[in-house]
Curated annotation (Swiss-Prot):
The chain crosses the membrane at residues 5-25. It comes from the Eukaryota. Its cofactor is Mg(2+). The keyword Nucleotide-binding applies. One of its GO terms (molecular function) is ATP hydrolysis activity. InterPro entries: AAA+_ATPase, AAA_N_dom, ATPase_AAA_core, Mitochondrial_chaperone_BCS1, P-loop_NTPase. One of its GO terms (biological process) is response to stress. Keywords: ATP-binding, Hydrolase, Magnesium, Membrane, Nucleotide-binding, Transmembrane, Transmembrane helix. It is a single-pass membrane protein. This is AAA-ATPase At3g28510. It catalyses: ATP + H2O = ADP + phosphate + H(+). Residues 326-339, 463-511 have a biased composition (Basic and acidic residues). ATP binds at G250, P251, P252, G253, T254, G255, K256, S257.
Amino acid sequence: MLETGAIWGITGTTVTSFMFFWAIYKQYVPAHFRAYVERYFHKMIGWISYYVDIKFTEYTDEGLKRSQAYDSIRNYLASKSTALAKRLKANETKNSKSLVFSMDDHEEIEDEFEGVKVKWYSNVKVIQPQSNYGQRSSEERRHFTLSFHRRHRGMIIETYLDHVLREGKAIGLMNRERKLYTNNSSQEWYPWRSGKWSNVPFHHPATFETLAMDPEKKEGIKKDLIKFSKGKDYYKKVGKPWKRGYLLFGPPGTGKSTMIAAIANFLDYDVYDLELTTVKDNSELKKLLLDTTSKSIIVIEDIDCSLDLTGQRKKKKEEDEEEDGEEKKEGEKKPKVDDKQSKVTLSGLLNSIDGLWSACSGEKIIVFTTNFVDKLDPALIRRGRMDNHIEMSYCKFEAFKVLAKNYLEIETHDLYGEIERKLEETDMSPADVAETLMPKSDEEDADICIKRLVKTLEEEKEKARKLAEEEEKKKAEKEAKKMKKAEEAEEKKKKTEEDEKKEKVKAKEENGNVSQQNGNSIDLNKKSDS
């Protein structure tokens, strides 16, 4: 009988030899021949194995979309993992102080359904592709594998998998936590890796009840949102993708971002904050939008500042006309375009949000915000693309009453009449009104805060008056300078004309003198000849 040391020695030699020949096989045997060998090896295993394997990958459609089946299976297996798996991953969930456990990578659990036992395997494959920037960047391709005896094939495919997907979807809805997403640079994401978007839990407290806006206007927006959320069959009947566009425009501080948060809380939707300046090109933009989920709001804030999307098509013709008559200077060089600069175009954005690609998934709201709606290209905000245009204006009396109730818990005050008059005369944003109403210490009560607002409104009115006077003064000075320049130009013109007249008279006199001298010379010549 061999000793333990000898056994380990033989084992080590065998493993070393196997690793050596495996390395030779991987390095020197052509890839197409290896594929041929592996194909027949798996076929041979299939002949002698009584088990069937079904693979569920994390991403489908060539890595463009996340698999809903994979997510449902993950939720289902998470409910089984606590009692069955040996290695677990722990995560927090909303409204719960306890942890939720799921299968760790390369773990397996056994499940039973109607007396039939099956096995689930959690797998991840890490590869090292060559990135565009010459660096080695890892990709993780995750998948679940279901293994069962082949005699149960019909029951597993027709009944068990339907049960798993249904249960997993229900668990996902129960544990769903709304999230706020932001897009990553394409250097950080790959087709099989969930790296296109980063997310954090979305816990913004804004609601329509706390939103400083006219109640009738708020009610109209809420009805529109409810109609949209229940309109799946209606949109299908009229032949439109199940999406809706909102344009929020108005001065800074008027509540555009708060409105987005209120919509998300009202509909229980996720929010995708799309930063266009980090998107490399139109193709990357499409991939980002395809990787968003249904029941979500896609937001592009301050779109008038995002790339060159503001009326560029109208300006193009004007610029071309101006350049027609200009000659290029010799040796003039065009500025180099930075390769890292975003190349997203207006047409690319329009096609992504409203073209054929927009119909790939439904129940989405697209929101644009801007401080200067007049700067935007009309094609970007036309009806049918941005269906609902909502002006977020300066604070008026109805909006003030909402703020007073939220911040001071009062619904009336002796100074309400004066505040209403001053709000009509003064442009003050809801954010500034809210900051003024907020108590700055425990000693400040509602009366102090209301009086402070009245004083602030008076100061703002005075500032506006002085600013208007300064603007009027500047305008008058500008007009005076313009008139002075016009007068100087007129005087210069008159002087030039007078100088030209004098030159003409002088030239005429000189010509007359020359003619007279020539005549005198002729007379003298005649006399000398005679």
